[in-house]
Regions:
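Glycine-rich adenosine-cofactor-binding loop
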Residues: 7, 90-93, 100, 109-133, ...
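Adenosine-phosphate binding glycine-rich loop
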Residues: 191-250
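ATP-dependent small-molecule kinase phosphotransfer cores
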Residues: 282-330, 334-339
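Conserved phosphate-donor/acceptor-positioning beta-strand/loop module used by diverse small-molecule
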Residues: 338-358
């Protein structure tokens, strides 16, 4: 029997790791083109599938029976073969309910603004209706109201949910909208889980709002799907799995004065945690040669541009120990790329203890 995730492009999916942790070692990835779907669904060795964009509607149409949730939303993200026929369910619905609870967000009686109009956004809409949302508004690039009409809702929206891929790895950090003008905003949900903290979520936290990323959504829907696949209740708590995945993905970022010991500490941490260590200054030196010579010939401003580009590239990766250059934190634009996947630790030493050699 085969289980897995069906999609068109699945390069950075966490689903196999989640399902392996849930006891399904045969779970794998299936990348298919639209013209391959009919033959794929007919494969008798397939027992269970999760389905992601752009095939959730095709999955709905391929199922012979449907759960009440799937019928209500018109979307299938989980397929299970029962007596030779495909049964469809929508565990994204359950994942979204879990996310709201995880982020301590009340939507009853609230005005909710959804960014996006795809299959996932329709599931969110039905869930919000069921929870008693006062009004649900979709912004889209295809139909009105459009993203450029967002100003009409600055003094109305209380909960914002991003159901688009804008801000997802590798095109991060990016955001569709600026949260600052929203006067009644209480919380933000972003279904993106890579990076852990999108630009939208980081701004939400800076504004003191409730914020939750897509990891609780992803894990909760996967747990529900796994229970359908294996026909047994999961022995692993959803919250424990979320914390484990976040810990694996989150970078450890060391900042501090030159000579404070970032490289020494970073290498030790990497060895202890089994992570890859990256010294940003060393990575830059591979490209431009000795940093001191570059600053002398090109100027510090030119070097800071090179440094910021390196931070942009490295910061979007996950599971690393990263040592920054001493002056990296003096550039405000470096914060988002570092914080999106990282937890930042400042190393300190008395000035007379700082290393000056090298």
């Amino acid at each position: 029997m085969k289980f897995g995730l069906l999609g068109r492009t699945l390069g950075h999916s966490y689903s196999p790791a989640i399902h392996h942790a849930l006891g399904n070692e045969s779970y794998t990835l299936f990348e298919k083109e639209p013209d391959q779907l009919a033959d794929f669904f007919a494969d008798p060795s397939l027992q269970g599938l999760n389905v992601t964009i752009p095939y959730k509607i095709a999955a709905y149409e391929a199922c012979q029976t449907l759960s009440d949730r799937a019928q209500k939303t018109g979307v299938v993200n989980t397929m299970v073969r029962r007596d030779g026929a495909w049964h469809g369910d929508n565990t994204d619905y359950l994942g979204f309910l879990y996310s709201l609870d995880y982020g301590h967000m009340e939507v009853a009686g609230k005005v909710c603004l959804i960014l996006g109009d795809g299959a996932s956004s329709h599931t969110l809409h039905i869930a919000l209706e069921d929870l008693g949302a006062k009004e649900i508004i979709h912004l889209s690039r295809k139909t009105a109201p459009f993203y450029q009409d967002v100003h009409h809702f600055y003094h109305k929206a209380q909960i914002i949910i991003n159901a688009t891929p804008v801000g997802m790895y590798p095109k991060c950090p990016q955001a569709l909208i600026d949260l600052a003008p929203f006067s009644l905003l209480e919380g933000v949900v972003d279904l993106i889980y890579n990076p852990l903290r999108t630009s939208l979520l980081l701004q939400a936290r800076q504004l003191g709002l409730k914020a939750v990323n897509g990891l609780p959504f992803l894990v909760a829907q996967a747990v529900a799907a796994s229970e359908l696949f294996l026909e047994s209740e999961s022995l692993i708590k959803t919250e424990e799995l979320i914390k484990s995945l976040q810990g694996d993905q989150e970078n450890i970022i060391l900042v501090g004065m030159p000579g404070v010991g970032k490289t020494t500490v970073g290498k030790a941490l990497a060895q202890r945690t089994g992570r890859t260590f990256i010294d940003i200054d060393q990575e830059i030196s591979k490209e431009i040669g000795a940093i001191s010579n570059y600053i002398q010939t090109q100027g510090e401003a030119a070097f800071r541009q090179v440094e910021s580009k390196a931070i942009q590239d490295i910061g979007k990766r996950g599971g690393l120990v990263i040592a920054t250059g001493g002056g990296a934190v003096t550039i405000e634009d470096n914060f988002l790329p570092l914080r999106q996947n990282g937890r930042i630790y400042q190393l300190t030493q008395p000035l007379d203890k700082l290393a000056t050699a090298g």
